[in-house]
């Protein structure tokens, strides 16, 4: 079996994938929605398999200009917890703070991202282990917010797409920036370094209607977010009539894949 390691923050970009899903928590004046879903992870040509049963809880208060999201999930040897909050700012949803915790076979990772629009900066903190060799990656950095640059996290991007608050570029694509750990172009899954920085990574979503299903399908490049991704195999999101994700497929290197789908039964 290959001993190449998986970074916990990047565990097949599972945090990113999980945050791109519909969820809801009750709020006094907000529109609330809850949705169960399932994550199936297959590693190294099926040598390792994980299933994660999740509940997303989302509360969106458009009149008050706030949203809150809570995500909890549990599976055999795998669990996660995500809490996120944001605000309606300059006509679009913008993140304020996101905290996440993930554990896979005892390997834990924690991250906190805080957005300060008055100071025009993002505080990014992460600590996690690689999957097999348990090598540590730590990021404590502050990233400036340049004027005129669109910034999201996965939650705000999902809400902006659903509410049609994400304007398209001339070529029809949807672009924004997401704060994450800076990855070198030749980084391998087990590579670590003494000091890490955070960065505003460009995120581009190309959406087209599928000829067979007639549903919108979005594709995006994961290589800026995971050393297990490759440009020749973009991630794919299938959207429903409400412009929310129904299914996600994340093909990776070394016979690895992540599939996320709503539970209909």
Predicted regions span which residues?
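N-terminal secretory signal peptides
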Residues: 1-21
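Acidic, serine/threonine-rich low-complexity disordered tracts
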Residues: 27-117, 165-265
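Compositionally biased, intrinsically disordered/low-complexity regions enriched for serine, proline
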Residues: 12, 19, 141-143, 248
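Intrinsically disordered, low-complexity regions of eukaryotic proteins
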Residues: 9-12, 118, 125, 155
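A charged, solvent-exposed segment within the mature domains of Sec-exported extracytoplasmic proteins
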Residues: 124-185
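Structured domain cores in non-transmembrane regions
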Residues: 98, 105-140
């Amino acid at each position: 079996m290959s001993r190449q390691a998986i970074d916990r923050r990047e565990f097949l970009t599972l945090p990113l994938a999980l945050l791109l899903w519909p969820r809801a928590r009750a709020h006094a004046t907000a529109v609330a929605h809850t949705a169960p879903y399932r994550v199936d992870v297959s590693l190294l040509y099926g040598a390792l398999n994980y299933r994660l049963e999740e509940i997303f809880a989302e509360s969106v208060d458009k009149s008050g200009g706030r949203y809150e999201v809570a995500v909890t999930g549990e599976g055999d040897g795998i669990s996660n917890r995500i809490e996120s909050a944001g605000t309606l700012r300059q006509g679009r949803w913008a993140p304020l703070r996101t905290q996440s915790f993930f554990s896979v076979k005892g390997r834990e990772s924690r991250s906190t991202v805080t957005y300060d629009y008055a100071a025009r900066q993002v505080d990014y903190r992460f600590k996690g282990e690689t999957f097999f060799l348990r090598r540590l990656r730590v990021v404590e950095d502050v990233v400036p917010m340049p004027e005129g640059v669109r910034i999201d996290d996965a939650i705000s991007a999902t809400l902006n797409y659903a509410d049609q608050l994400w304007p398209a570029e001339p070529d029809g694509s949807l672009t924004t920036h997401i704060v994450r750990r800076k990855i070198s172009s030749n980084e391998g899954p087990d590579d670590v370094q003494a000091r890490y920085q955070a960065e505003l990574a460009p995120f581009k979503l190309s959406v087209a209607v599928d000829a067979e299903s007639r549903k919108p399908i979005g594709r995006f490049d994961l290589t800026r977010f995971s050393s297990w991704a490759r440009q020749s195999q973009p991630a794919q999101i299938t959207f429903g009539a409400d412009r929310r994700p129904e299914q996600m497929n994340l093909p990776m290197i070394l016979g690895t894949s992540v599939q996320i789908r709503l539970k209909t039964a």
